[in-house]
Amino acid sequence: MKKTLVSMLTLAVLLGSLSLNAQTTDIKPPKNSILSGQQQIMNEKAPSPLPPIDESNVMWKKTVIREIDFRQKINQVFYYPINPTEDWRNLITVIYDGINSGDITPYRVENNIDDMVTPLTRDDFEKENVKVGDPPVIWNEELGTEVPNEIAFKDRMLNVTRLRIKEDWYFDKKMSQFLVRIIALGPIVVDDDGGLSQVCWIPYEPSRPVLAKAFAFNRNNSAQRRTYDEVLQKRIFDSYIIKEENVYDRYINSYAFNIDALYESERIKNEMFDFEQSLWEY
């Protein structure tokens, strides 16, 4: 009789434990927003295809480099949030995550040229962009080898407050349109001494699948979600030209200073606008 009672009690305890485990397994994580499922939808999204360019139809082209300052209100979507959340990551975090996953390949900033020539591995990228004064590598006791100093690297990446965009403006005579095509992105770090340093070049076209799956914060309506690719393609930012292609290969700040540099930037922009208008007859 006692054995039967003990067996029944043991069975009851086991059944209760299984029931509790089943209930625990069935518990779903709470939603942080009514739009919490939007990121999963975005993970399947591909960037909008760009029209192919027939080089024989390009009758005019100018390459310019412009700079986006994240301190401007309209451009703050590129800098915030500093700490990633379920739905939002700032642009440099999106780029770094893409480099970590192998979906984005950074290129070294070469001396005196703005072309992408030398690709960087993730380790090389981190070593070359640690905070000034910190060692690029540290000793890892577990691995028994030197590894990139990720703490110093991430500390420096917090100071990415500008973005350079290299782009080609061109006139397609077949389509009769004045168009622009982004070539590369260049994050800019403000160092402790106030100097500006470009950390790398990111080729835009191969990076679009990553940028098209990351939301940029919409301060006016968080239900209308835009990706970083859409923000860049739709030109939802403010910027100023810092260089146009020229025979001396000079940046504006090498021959114009302070207010004169702004005037020169506006002159280049107006010159491009006037060229487009001069193509039409009214």
Q: Regions from the language model: what does each represent?
A:
Residues 138, 157, 178, 193-195:
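Mid-length scaffold segments of soluble, non-membrane domains
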Residues 158-160, 180-182, 197-199:
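Extracytoplasmic
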Residues 1-31:
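Bacterial Sec-dependent N-terminal signal peptides
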Residues 17, 176, 213-215:
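Short conserved micro-motifs at the rims of enzyme active sites and ligand-binding pockets
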Residues 172-178:
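Short, solvent-exposed beta-strand/turn "edge" segments of beta-rich domains on protein surfaces
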Residues 23-171, 205-282:
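A domain-level signal for the mature, folded cores of soluble proteins
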Residues 190-193, 201, 212-214:
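KE-rich/KEKE low-complexity, intrinsically disordered/coiled-coil-prone tracts
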